[in-house]
A protein has these predicted regions:
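Secretory targeting and sorting signals
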Residues: 1-30
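Carbohydrate-interacting regions of secretory-pathway proteins
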Residues: 155, 269-455
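Helical hinge/lid and interdomain linker segments adjacent to catalytic or ligand-binding clefts
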Residues: 51-55, 59-138
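Catalytic beta-strand/loop cores that center a nucleophilic Ser/Cys/Thr
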Residues: 152, 156-229
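Extracellular glycan-recognition/adhesion modules and their associated mucin-like linkers
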Residues: 455-479, 494-521, 535-563, 581-585
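Aromatic-rich beta-strand patches that line glycan-recognition/binding surfaces
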Residues: 335-345, 483-489, 524-530, 568-573
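Extracellular ligand-binding/catalytic regions of CAZymes and related secreted enzymes
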Residues: 31-37, 44-48, 62, 73, ...
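A glycine-rich, often tryptophan-bearing local segment used as a flexible ligand/cofactor-contacting loop or short
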Residues: 104, 109-178
Length: 585
């Protein structure tokens, strides 16, 4: 928020919206007409290259040629170059390094030999992108790494027929152009496993809308995930030749490619256990405080007027929780998300008794996007790397654990704040969305919450990624006390699978990340050791991306300055250089 309102500049001439009372959260004043939100002209994507691989060792889809043509057309219109091949010899580390993403276009069967598989794994571990289309799930059944990359493998399919696709995530670039449902005709795969527990589901099939679905009503059909250092996107559509002439499906593919290539950002962590607070159909449970309000159209709340706040009065939240929501600003618009405030019809109560997680492109650093407004700036480099530009959707996760407030933008932590003011305690309170003032129009969708009650949050497991995209690794997967800890190309092995405990330990292979002899001098070895609950085994994540050992006051550091496979980690004075930045699961 700001206490000084900006003048309105450059508003698009828009149609007048008719505000139906049941569809709008407004104060008890007469409805007002508003102009359509302005959106900045999108900037051109940076130039990059995409490899399209369509080798088939099994069934060959007649739509492959149409798919290649469509992808070339998308590239020509969106500043990427497509190289299409069926030659597996292309899969060398040198060749693959030219590409921001590799598309498996209805590949089938065993298409890469062991050497080529290794090269592809190395490419992905270095931050490459993968896009799987349709029969990419009918590929490489004997390569476990690939099954993890694709997310799920083909089981069966019924006849080609129309079906209703439910769009679960309308913020991702591959689905943001779609409505809440999408009517399509295609060949609908059933999968051997459900990817929901390991991937972020973007769209799923309504099995009641067609015949032959075998996934018990939970049938993901498009998803994304971060996997072994890579970005992986898969869509089950694309069997038919007609698919590649369908504007909506082509835009779906474009969004998947742009995300896999790192052009756009999204929260692609697996998501389960959330309860909807706003599902796009009505504002039941919400109440407007102060002037202005929100319009409701296309499953989206858009702020207008102000200064006011739409708050969830149906329930006060206590204990630990994770709040997620999607938001979009058209330009330099101002809004925010409030947490931890008492029930009140005065929007200033939230300002004075809670915390606002800011949405605003320009202001002082403690009052711009990702900041705890007026209290703590976001990690600006992390924020800027995670932020989609005006006119695009972004996703916040606001995680409350006791008095700790963590903010994630598109899946990346950008702020870590601890409250010390009893008046603003985060242990109980409501949540709200700010409508800041005339000219500030920010849209919100898909507001959901996952509560842990008063229980501590559970442990989190996965890779710990550091400098040069490499993973924290146990040398040769050894389990002896004193085994070296190093960085290594991410490989999804048990030697790189760490569990962050609620006791601030990092465990792998049944033992703990440990500072040798509990020392505190620069260069002290960090090793694997039997867990013993000492201060030498405690690590806390900082907002700047470092992992700090509270006992020594020093940070986990990849030694030296070249950071290749096998570089050991050690203890060192915190300096926030790239070799001290770690991304936790």
């Amino acid at each position: 928020m700001r206490t000084q309102f900006r003048s309105v500049l450059g508003l698009l001439a828009g149609t007048v919206l008719c505000l139906a009372p049941q569809a709008v959260a407004l104060p008890s004043t007469a409805p007002v007409a508003i102009t359509a939100p302005r959106e900045a002209a999108p900037a051109a994507d940076p130039a990059y290259k995409v490899l399209v691989f369509s080798r088939t060792a099994g069934f060959r889809h007649s739509s492959i040629d149409e798919g290649i043509t469509a992808l070339r057309d998308l590239g020509a219109a969106n500043n990427f170059t497509v190289d299409a091949t069926e030659d597996p010899q292309t899969f060398t580390t040198t060749n693959l390094a030219e590409y921001r993403a590799v598309v498996f276009l209805s590949t089938t069967g065993d298409v890469l030999d062991n050497t080529q598989q290794t090269a592809f794994e190395q490419y992905l571990g270095s931050g490459g992108g993968y896009v799987g289309i349709h029969a990419a799930a009918d590929t490489e059944y004997d390569w476990p790494f690939y099954e993890g990359l694709a997310g799920a493998l083909f089981q069966s399919h019924p006849a080609i027929q129309p079906a209703t696709v439910k769009i679960e995530d309308r913020a991702h670039d591959s689905t943001a152009h779609l409505g809440r449902t999408w009517q399509r005709t295609d060949e609908w795969y059933n999968y051997r496993t459900n990817p929901r527990s390991t991937a972020h589901v973007l769209a799923s099939l309504d099995e009641s809308s067609y015949s032959g679905g075998t996934m018990s009503g939970d049938h993901p059909i498009a998803w994304c995930k971060n996997y072994a250092g890579a970005r992986a996107f898969y869509t089950g559509g694309g069997h038919t030749e007609e698919s590649y002439a369908d504007t909506a499906f082509r835009r779906h593919l474009l969004g998947g490619i742009r995300w896999a290539a790192g052009v756009t950002q999204a929260d692609c962590r697996a998501e389960t256990g959330y309860t909807s607070l706003f599902d796009g159909t009505n504002t039941t449970g919400w109440k407007q405080a102060g002037p202005g309000g929100f319009t409701l159209a296309d499953g989206t709340l858009t702020s207008q007027g102000g200064l006011g706040m739409l708050w969830y009065n149906a329930r006060e939240f206590t204990g630990d929780y994770s709040l997620k929501l999607d938001w979009k600003a058209g330009g330099d618009d101002n809004s925010g998300v409030f947490v931890g405030f008492p029930a009140s019809d005065d929007p200033w109560s939230a300002v004075n008794n809670g915390y606002e997680i800011q949405i605003d492109a320009t202001d002082t650093v403690d009052r711009t996007t990702g900041a705890v407004y007026g209290f703590q700036s976001a990690d600006i480099p992390a924020r800027d790397a995670a932020l989609n530009p005006p006119g695009s959707w972004n996703t916040y996760e606001i995680r409350v654990t006791g008095e700790r407030l963590e903010i994630f933008l598109n899946g990346r932590k950008i702020n870590d704040f601890t409250n010390t003011d009893p008046v603003r305690s985060l242990k109980q309170g409501h949540i709200g969305l700010q409508n800041h003032g005339d000219g500030d129009q920010v849209a919100f969708r898909n507001i959901r919450i996952k509560q842990a009650g008063n229980e501590p949050p559970g442990p989190r497991s996965g890779a710990v990624r550091g400098v040069n995209g490499k993973c924290l690794d146990i040398d040769n997967a050894g389990t002896a006390d004193g085994t070296k800890i190093q960085i290594w190309t991410c490989n999804n092995s048990g030697a790189q699978h760490w569990t962050i405990g609620t006791d601030n330990t990092l465990k792998a292979l049944g033992k703990c990340l440990d500072i040798s002899e509990g020392a505190n001098t620069d260069g002290t070895k960090v090793q694997l050791w039997t867990c013993n609950n000492t201060g030498a085994q405690k690590w806390t994540a900082q907002a700047d991306g470092t992992l700090r050992n509270p006992q020594s006051g020093k940070c986990l550091d990849a030694s030296g300055s070249t950071w290749n496979d096998g570089t050991p980690v050690h203890l060192w004075t915190c300096h926030t250089g790239p070799n001290q930045k770690w991304t936790l699961p």
